[in-house]
C-alpha cells in the first residue's frame, strides 16, 4: 500500500491524516502538509493515524521536526487513533510527553 498524506485546516488547527507507512518515504508529502497552503497561524496539529499501519524511527523524527518547525508547545500536537503497536513504539522511544 502506498502511503498517503492528507491535510485540512480548521482555523488555527491543522489536521493531517497518514494512511499506509509513516516513514521516510512520506517526507516531502508530510512537510508539504504543514508548510504549503496554510491560511492562518497554526496553534495545534491533530495527526490521525487511523489508516497508518506502521511507524518507524524516521516517522517519529518527522513528528519531532513538525513540532520544532512550527514552534509548538508540548501538548499542541495530538496523535489520535494510533494502533497499539504504534503507541507502544512511541512509549518505548519516550516520546509520549511530546504528543
Q: Where is each model-derived feature located?
A:
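Amphipathic alpha-helical interaction surfaces in cytosolic regulatory modules
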Residues: 21-99
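Short beta-strand/loop segment at the start of cytosolic alpha/beta domains
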Residues: 1-17
Amino acid at each position: 500500500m502506498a502511503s498517503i498524506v492528507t491535510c485540512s485546516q480548521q482555523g488555527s488547527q491543522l489536521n493531517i491524516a497518514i494512511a499506509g507507512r509513516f516513514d521516510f518515504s512520506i517526507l516531502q508529502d508530510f512537510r508539504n502538509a504543514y508548510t504549503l497552503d496554510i491560511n492562518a497561524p497554526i496553534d495545534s496539529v491533530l495527526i490521525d493515524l487511523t489508516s497508518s499501519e506502521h511507524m518507524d524511527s524516521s516517522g517519529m523524527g518527522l513528528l519531532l521536526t513538525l513540532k520544532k518547525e512550527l514552534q509548538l508547545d508540548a501538548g499542541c500536537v495530538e496523535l489520535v487513533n494510533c494502533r497499539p503497536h504504534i503507541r507502544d513504539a512511541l512509549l518505548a522511544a519516550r516520546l509520549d510527553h511530546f504528543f
